[in-house]
Design a protein with these regions (language model features):
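Condensing-enzyme catalytic core mediating Claisen C-C bond formation in acyl metabolism
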Residues: 1-43, 47, 129, 141-147
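Phosphate/pyrophosphate-binding loops at sites that engage ATP/ADP/AMP, CoA/4′-phosphopantetheine
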Residues: 47-64, 112-117
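Non-catalytic alpha-helical scaffold/packing segments enriched in small hydrophobic residues
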Residues: 21, 40, 44-52, 62, ...
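Short, functionally important structural connectors and interaction interfaces within domains
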Residues: 14, 30, 50, 89-92, ...
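Short N-terminal helix-initiation segments at or just after the protein's N-terminus
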Residues: 10-13, 54, 67-73
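Claisen-condensing/thiolase-fold acyl-transfer catalytic domains that form or cleave C-C bonds
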Residues: 42, 64-147
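A short, structure-level motif marking secondary-structure boundaries and short turns
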Residues: 33-35, 60-62, 93-94
């Protein structure tokens, strides 16, 4: 529709060969090789984010807001630098919520909406990574904002 949001581009990837650096055993025990996860998470978020931006046919400078997985501020800072997008364009709420895993992106987007950081027609990059190693990104054009 003319005033609705739109999915402009996306990326989904996995690197199963990295399964052993971040996984949960049966029973719920989580194993993480911290420094290796940091390095691979930055690569995954950067490559997936760039692929979604390319898929959308836009440039990093056109991205108004980045809503990343809230695992670690250092991962976000490094990924933003490598994406060529100022850190100020990222939403960071991990200091309020900690790492809420798969819920971190929608929670961060909710904070961005509540704080009026999202405007009609903004191009927003959603980008995350997780165990397995997996990564996913989407560029959306935000629709009309009511209220």
């Amino acid at each position: 529709s003319n005033n609705g949001g739109q999915l402009l581009g996306w990326d989904l990837r996995s690197a199963g060969e990295l399964r052993d650096i971040l996984f949960a055993d049966i029973g719920g025990t989580i194993y993480m090789a911290g420094s290796e996860v940091f390095r691979k998470a930055v690569i995954a978020m950067t490559e997936s984010g760039k692929a979604a931006i390319d898929s959308a046919g836009v440039s990093p400078s056109e991205i108004s807001l980045v809503v990343p997985h809230q695992a670690n501020i250092r991962i976000i800072e490094t990924s933003m630098r490598k994406l060529g997008i100022p850190f100020e364009n990222a939403v960071w709420v991990g200091d309020k919520t900690a790492n809420t895993s798969a819920a971190s992106i929608p929670i961060a987007l909710g904070y961005a909406l509540d704080s009026k950081r999202v405007k009609a027609n903004d191009l927003i990059l959603l980008v995350g990574f997780g165990a397995g190693m997996t990564a996913a990104s989407a560029v959306i054009k935000w629709g009309e904002i009511n209220g």
